Structure formats: structure tokens, C-alpha cells
């Protein structure tokens, strides 16, 4: 993928200083400045006790640069309010759809942001390798928070050559299929429990509704310079399901090649859906229309009754039109993208990571805040429409108001099933955020063959 962060629609630049959302009421206008590392365990009292260790940061400004843009940017901006009120600092937020390219342009020009949300660990490795003097190792407070509130694997994703740089931020579950509960009920369709049942359901929809022009699936992979990432998620989900977690992890490190028969078999299964003109692209167009449809719009034909299913991550909840009821009995909901057997339930997921590019106390404090339970719970409360979760164990699931977020959190916290972190996010940036996206787009837009695509991606691996 591409991560959770390539999915965003327009550029948004805003300061959260003037926002009116009150997530926490601070106990004093001028916080005390006691010693501490910023690793408080949370505050239920609504005061600034958990923020005291950050010190008095009045008059200080921290700039944040991300690829998260409207409509997903506002909850992030709102979630900074408690930190601003309790420390006196101001957070200046900038989101850009061209983040992946522009961050490196800014680093080359010496115009680095204080904080950046890195959507791919592979990109983090690239930045550390190319700009070692620009990026700053994570603060002690940040490191302590991650040790306490996250599984060890998450810290590993933000570590390069033994040095910890970037703390996890949000997390997401990719293994979802969005659908209309009422459309399923009206047609007597049941939620598939295996991959074969999913294909059988798709064939049943073609038989029942093909003559009406209604398709089983609708999709879009457009995302500016990150176009193609939704298609990579499809392949990752199928590799994880068909080949298993061991092959999946070896694929990430290039021990298993892109043109390995196991990866080719998974791509064949993806093509049986996305390149099947009987299956796609409901309410939008032909197979090639998938490449020109923005990912935000890819699932909307479900609401018009023109398609039945849309495979997309938990964060897609934020892209349904205002007023859409996202629940088991609502306008739309999601079911788990089934495994090959009913007992096999691997989960594909991803997340963003917070890196610092300035060694100042206010920057270290804000990075620590973003790794804390205080921020995770503030962010959950600031996202009333849903579409966001975290792997932070300090997150109270009661603060997740959306049924899909609660379902996601339950999957993220289920250690009995294999969890595969988004493969392209862990690959080198030129592959995971480069050739993989581009070739999957050409696979659809230009009808390149499976072999051509897989060989081209493999050739790009340096």
C-alpha cells in the first residue's frame, strides 16, 4: 500500500490553534514545567496532569507534514488540541497529496518539517539512507511510550540499522470487503466465510444481475502520484492468504521474488476479479476505468445499487458521504476478506510512523505525545465518523464509536491469527512506493500481462 496515507484527496493546510473542539479541559493557562519524559499513562480527570512532563512550551510552534488530506486531516488537527491547551505550543499542520515526492524535495532544499508522518517503513529507510543528517532519532519519551504501549514488532518497523527513528501512529486493517447489508438481505446473499465462497457469490451476482448492468465489484486505484496502491493491497491480501505468512515475509525482503510462481498465482487470483469484465466496474465503467477512478470514489456505486462489493481498508469509512450509516444494519458495512479456509483468518494491515527532523524540546515533546495513550484516545474521540484505529494498547475501545473501528481493533488485537504488515510499505521505497504502484496501474490501464508486470517490478529491486 501505500499506506494509509496515500489515500487523500486535496491539499489541506491549517493551524489547529484556532480549532474549537474540546477533547480535554486543561487545568491551568500556564502549565508547570516539572521534569519528565512525557510518558504519562493517561488522564481520566480531564486536566493537564498527563501533559506536565512536556513542560511549558508557550510561544513554540511545531510543524507537521503529512499526506493525510481532507476529509481525514481534520480529526488529526483536532486531536492536537489537548497538547496545545496544556503546553501552550502551537501545531501547524500541512497535508499534501504529493507528500512522498515533496518531503524529499524539502529535505534536499534544507526546508524540512519538524515532524512528518511517514506512510511506508520502506520510505523511512530511504530517508535515513539519503538524509542521515536531517532525520533525528526518536526522543527518550517516545521510545519509552512505544516500548510500553505497542507490540515489539511495531517498534521494529520504525527502526533502521538498529536506531529507532519513527513511532507508530495510526493502524488499519486492509482485509475488508465493503457491502450493503440491505442489498445482501434483499437478494438472500450471505457473508462468505472462505475465498471460494466469495468467488461463488460473485458468480451468483453476475447470474442474478448481469443483465441489468449491475456488477459484483467496483474499484478505483487513483491517488495522485500514489496511484496504484489499492491494487497492491489486493495482491498482498492474496499472497498472505494463498502462500502464507512465511512466504509473505520472505517476499518483503526479496528472498521470494516478485516473479516467483507463488506470487504469480496470487496475482492470477486478483486478476480473476479486477480484470474480469463480468465482475467490474459496477456503476463506473470497464476494467480500465479502475485506473482512472479515484480510490475515494471506488466504493460509492454500492450506495446507488450498481455494485455489491468493494475491497478496501478500514479507513475507507471516512470516505462515505456525510449521513451514511456505517453499521451492520446500516447503509454500508464491511466483512472480513475471507481466507482460503474458514479457520484461516490472516489480516493485512498497515500504519503510519512519526519521524522528527528537528532536535528541539517542543518537537521531542510532540513526538512523544503522538505515541501516547492520551493522543490515541484524543484521536479516537476526534473521529466521530469513524475510520481510524491504533495498535496502541492504551487506546480504550469504548472511545471507538464506529462499529467498523471496533471490528478493526478486535482483529488487530487478536494474536491467534497471522498479521501481515503491508508489504509494499516495508519494501525499499523505489519498489514499494514506486515500481509496484506503477506496474499494477499499467496492469489494469494498459492490460499488461501478469508476467510483464511481475518481471518489471522484480527488475527494479536494487
Predicted features by range, described:
Residues 47, 58-69, 89-94, 115, ...:
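Short, well-ordered beta-strand elements
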Residues 46-56, 121-175:
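Hinge/lid segment of periplasmic solute-binding proteins
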Residues 79-152, 182-193, 301, 308-309, ...:
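Extracytoplasmic "Venus flytrap"/periplasmic binding protein-like
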Residues 309-315, 321-387:
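Extracytoplasmic/periplasmic substrate-recognition and gating elements
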Residues 252-288:
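Glycine-centered hinge/linker elements that transmit conformational signals in sensory
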Residues 127-129, 154-196, 220-251, 348-355, ...:
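Periplasmic solute-binding protein
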Residues 26-50:
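Short, low-complexity, disordered segments immediately C-terminal to signal peptides
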Residues 386-391, 406-461:
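C-terminal capping/gating helix-and-loop segments adjacent to ligand/active sites or protein-protein/ligand interfaces
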Amino acid at each position: 500500500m501505500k499506506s494509509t496515507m496515500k489515500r487523500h484527496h486535496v491539499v489541506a493546510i491549517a493551524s489547529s490553534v484556532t480549532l474549537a473542539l474540546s477533547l480535554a479541559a486543561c487545568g491551568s493557562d500556564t502549565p508547570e514545567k516539572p521534569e519528565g519524559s512525557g510518558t504519562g499513562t493517561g488522564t481520566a480527570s480531564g486536566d493537564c496532569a498527563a501533559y506536565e512532563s512536556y513542560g511549558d512550551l508557550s510561544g513554540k510552534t511545531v510543524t507537521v507534514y503529512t499526506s493525510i488530506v481532507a476529509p481525514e486531516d481534520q480529526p488529526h488537527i483536532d486531536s492536537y488540541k489537548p497538547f496545545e491547551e496544556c503546553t501552550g505550543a502551537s501545531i501547524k499542520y500541512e497535508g499534501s497529496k504529493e507528500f512522498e515526492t515533496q518531503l524529499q524535495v524539502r529535505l534536499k532544499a534544507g526546508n524540512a518539517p519538524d515532524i512528518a508522518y511517514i506512510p511506508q517503513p520502506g520510505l523511512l529507510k530511504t530517508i535515513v539512507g539519503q538524509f542521515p543528517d536531517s532525520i533525528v532519532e526518536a526522543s527518550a519519551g517516545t521510545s519509552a511510550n512505544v516500548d510500553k504501549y505497542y507490540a515489539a514488532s511495531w517498534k521494529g518497523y520504525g527502526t533502521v540499522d538498529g536506531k529507532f527513528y519513527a513511532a507508530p501512529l495510526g493502524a488499519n486493517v486492509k482485509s475488508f470487503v465493503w457491502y450493503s447489508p440491505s442489498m445482501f438481505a434483499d437478494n438472500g446473499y450471505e457473508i462468505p466465510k472462505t475465498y471460494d465462497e466469495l468467488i461463488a457469490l460473485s458468480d451468483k451476482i453476475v447470474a442474478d444481475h448481469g443483465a441489468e448492468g449491475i456488477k459484483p465489484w467496483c474499484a478505483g486505484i487513483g491517488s495522485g502520484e500514489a496511484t496504484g496502491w489499492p491494487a497492491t493491497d489486493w495482491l498482498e491480501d492474496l499472497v498472505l492468504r494463498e502462500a502464507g505468512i512465511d512466504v509473505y515475509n520472505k517476499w518483503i525482503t526479496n528472498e521470494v521474488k516478485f516473479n516467483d510462481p507463488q506470487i504469480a498465482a496470487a496475482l492470477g487470483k486478483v486478476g480473476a476479479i479486477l480484470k474480469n469484465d463480468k465482475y467490474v466496474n459496477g456503476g463506473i465503467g470497464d476494467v480500465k476505468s479502475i485506473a482512472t477512478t479515484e480510490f475515494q470514489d471506488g466504493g460509492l456505486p454500492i450506495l446507488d445499487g450498481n455494485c455489491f462489493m468493494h475491497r478496501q481498508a478500514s479507513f475507507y469509512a471516512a470516505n462515505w458521504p456525510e449521513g451514511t450509516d456505517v453499521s451492520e444494519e446500516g447503509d454500508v458495512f464491511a466483512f472480513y476478506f475471507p481466507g482460503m479456509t474458514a479457520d484461516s483468518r490472516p489480516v493485512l494491515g498497515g500504519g503510519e510512523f512519526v519521524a522528527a527532523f528537528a532536535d528541539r524540546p517542543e518537537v521531542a515533546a510532540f513526538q512523544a505525545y503522538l505515541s501516547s495513550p492520551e493522543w490515541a484516545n484524543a484521536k479516537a474521540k476526534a473521529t466521530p465518523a469513524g475510520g481510524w484505529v491504533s495498535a496502541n494498547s492504551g487506546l480504550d475501545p469504548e472511545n471507538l464509536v464506529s462499529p467498523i473501528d471496533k471490528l478493526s481493533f478486535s482483529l488487530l488485537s487478536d494474536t491467534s491469527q497471522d498479521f501481515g504488515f503491508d508489504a509494499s510499505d516495508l519494501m525499499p521505497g523505489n519498489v514499494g512506493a514506486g515500481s509496484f504502484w506503477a506496474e499494477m496501474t499499467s496492469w489494469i490501464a494498459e492490460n499488461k500481462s501478469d508476467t510483464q508486470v511481475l518481471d518489471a517490478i522484480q527488475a527494479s529491486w536494487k
